[in-house]
């Protein structure tokens, strides 16, 4: 009888362990069987496995970049930095950012570390490199590489961002150029099953009256505010990625500004003195070519020339989202 009892107890323990494992891994349809356990190396030289170390049971944001990119990657990194600042100390504890290089031969850990420092990246955000073929497979599994696209063609890399909660199986593809508050809300609230307690209870009666922003203001908020401010104080400018644009239409010639907005990459290649000075002043982060047309250029300059623009609230100026209640 004692032997039977011991055997039954052992079976129950084994069953409980199996159920625990199933609960940990089986609640999500996207688990170890789907995600490759790609070996990667971060900017500090730490070797990590994609599934085991980086995403298992975590809320994450994942994008693919390369440091030699002069078009969209700098703006993408700057926008995600805004999101990181909004989330505050929760990044690295409750959620994690990963930027994976698609040019691992050039993007060594040392290069990635220097790149992260240029953008004043905080804790909880890893920049990763590894084997090209393995990273290519990872891009495909995450839906960020069309099988018809040559993975060697870096100019065709996806600009989308993958955010998700591996434990619940919630995954979505979003634009990194989305409003930073919306991205922060998705990462900090909706993907976390709204576990953050609201610090205040606001009344709709106290809500400010909404106004329709001008086309120029919309352009500034969506294309420029990740790197530029309007009327920032000296303390904020010490961490700035680009110059403050308050009064820029009075400081620069109109023709220079128009061309700079249309083709900053070409002006840098031509070593325009002002463009080169700005490039050196701001950690060699080149302004990306945003593909603005003439109508957009004029709308943006019109907004920047408006004195009221200097008082426009800056994206990213709000305090971090509240910490989760304990």
Segments (PLM) and residue ranges:
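Axial heme c-ligation environment in periplasmic c-type cytochrome domains
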Residues: 238-247, 264-296
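Gly/Gly-Pro-rich "capping" loops immediately C-terminal to redox-active cysteine motifs
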Residues: 229-263
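Structural microenvironment flanking redox-active thiols in thiol-disulfide oxidoreductases
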Residues: 76-138, 253
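Electrostatic cytochrome c docking/interface patches
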Residues: 193-221, 234-241
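The canonical Cys-X-X-Cys-His
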Residues: 70-73, 161, 216, 222-231, ...
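Short active-site neighborhood of thiol/selenol oxidoreductases, capturing the structured segment around
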Residues: 50-74, 80
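A short beta-strand-turn-helix
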Residues: 39-59, 208
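Short, internal strand/loop/helix patches
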Residues: 114-158, 267-286
């Amino acid at each position: 009888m004692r032997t039977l009892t011991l055997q039954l107890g052992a079976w129950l323990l084994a069953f409980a362990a199996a159920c625990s494992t199933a609960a940990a891994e089986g609640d999500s349809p996207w688990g170890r069987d789907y995600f490759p356990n790609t070996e990667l190396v971060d900017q500090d030289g730490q070797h990590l496995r994609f599934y085991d170390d980086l995403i298992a049971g975590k809320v994450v944001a994942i994008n693919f970049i390369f440091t030699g990119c002069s078009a969209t990657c700098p703006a993408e990194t700057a926008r995600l930095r805004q999101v990181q600042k909004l989330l505050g100390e929760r990044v690295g504890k409750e959620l994690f950012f990963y930027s994976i290089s698609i040019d691992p031969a050039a993007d060594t850990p040392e290069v990635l570390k220097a790149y992260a420092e240029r953008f004043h990246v905080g804790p909880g955000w890893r920049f990763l490199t590894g084997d090209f073929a393995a990273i290519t497979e990872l891009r495909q599994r995450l839906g960020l590489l069309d099988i018809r696209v040559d993975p060697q063609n870096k100019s065709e890399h996806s600009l989308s961002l993958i955010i998700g909660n591996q434990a619940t199986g919630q995954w979505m593809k979003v634009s990194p150029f989305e409003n930073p508050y919306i991205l922060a809300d998705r990462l900090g609230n909706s993907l976390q099953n709204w576990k953050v307690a609201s610090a205040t209870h606001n009344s709709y009666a106290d809500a400010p009256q909404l106004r329709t922003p001008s086309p120029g203001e919309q352009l500034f908020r969506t294309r420029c505010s990740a790197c530029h401010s309007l009327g920032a104080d000296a303390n904020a400018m010490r961490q700035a990625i680009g110059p403050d644009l308050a009064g820029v239409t009075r400081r620069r010639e109109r023709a220079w500004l128009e061309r700079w907005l249309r083709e900053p990459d070409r002006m840098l290649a031509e070593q325009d003195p002002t463009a080169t000075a700005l490039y050196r002043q701001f950690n060699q982060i080149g302004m990306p070519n945003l593909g603005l047309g003439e109508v957009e250029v004029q709308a943006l300059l019109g907004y920047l020339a408006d004195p009221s623009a200097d008082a426009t609230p800056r994206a990213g100026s709000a305090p971090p989202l509240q910490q989760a209640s304990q």
